[in-house]
Regions:
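Soluble small-group transferase modules, centered on the S-adenosyl donor enzyme superfamily
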Residues: 1-14, 56, 70-79, 98, ...
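The AdoMet/dcAdoMet-binding core of the Class I SAM-like
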Residues: 1-137, 141-143, 153
Length: 248
């Protein structure tokens, strides 16, 4: 979805290696010249190699670059901008992760998005309450001029957001032309996606719908770390965010 939102992207960055499948999928775009994947734990790359060949591009594609560093520290030390930044950190109850869902982080990360670029933020809707989940949405709502919310799993969400950078801030349609390329089609088939319309059907909300509610909702901040304070509790009580499930 991120690649099809910004089909002309040349430079991309991803926060969080995980299994390597997201990086592999992004590298399916033949228009992308470089993808930097930032992972704080080097052992994740060791584990990810067990998933070959379905993530081969991460380790074998010359356009792929793995950086072992804290995401905030990495961005603070570079002078570069990316056509998109995809943030797929661990679950918010993992120590330190909640700081990647704050107003301050979104303020900072915007500096590294090229004009016309986007941020794609993944967050899960399981083991988290509606109240806490909406603190993340409210933080992002404060800092981005437009965004779309896609339901990408039974309880997983991808928020694709555009900052107000002087360029037209409205998000355009997903690009069917890029999806038609051989590697992208193959990647789609692995995920059970045969057509862009299937991805468009995952769209459940946008800023116009959510802003009136989020404008008055508490936002997750460094000084008011609602997510850090409540994520472990929500996990313990097996909380589940239900509000967005009603948006179809």
């Amino acid at each position: 979805i991120t690649a099809l939102t910004r089909p002309d992207a040349k430079q991309g960055a991803l926060i969080g290696l995980g299994s390597g499948l997201t990086s592999h999928a992004l590298l399916a775009s033949d228009r992308l010249e470089s993808l930097t994947t930032i992972e704080i734990e080097p052992e994740m790359a060791v584990a990810a190699r067990h998933f070959t060949p379905v993530n081969d591009r991460v380790f074998k594609d010359d356009r792929s670059r793995l950086i072992y560093d804290d995401a905030k520290a990495y961005f603070a030390g570079i002078d570069a901008r990316y056509d998109y930044i995809v943030s797929v950190p661990s679950n918010p109850w993992v120590s330190g992760v909640s700081s990647l869902f704050t107003v301050e982080f979104y303020q900072e990360v915007k500096r590294y998005i090229a004009p016309g670029g986007v941020l794609a933020q993944w967050i899960q809707g399981y083991e988290i309450s509606d109240r806490l989940l909406m603190t993340v949405f409210a933080a992002l709502d404060r800092e981005f001029a437009d965004y779309r919310v896609y339901r990408v799993g039974s309880r997983d969400y991808l928020i694709v957001a555009r900052p107000d950078d002087g360029e037209p801030s409205k998000l355009g349609p997903l690009d069917a032309g890029l999806f038609a390329s051989a590697d992208m089609r193959e990647q789609g088939e692995l995920l059970g996606v045969a057509d862009v319309s299937q991805l468009e059907a995952m769209l459940i909300a946008n800023r116009k719908m959510l802003h009136p509610f989020l404008a008055t909702h508490p936002a997750n901040q460094d000084a008011r770390p609602y997510l850090d304070d409540g994520a472990e509790r929500d996990r313990f009580f097996r909380a589940s965010a239900e509000m967005l499930l009603a948006l179809r």
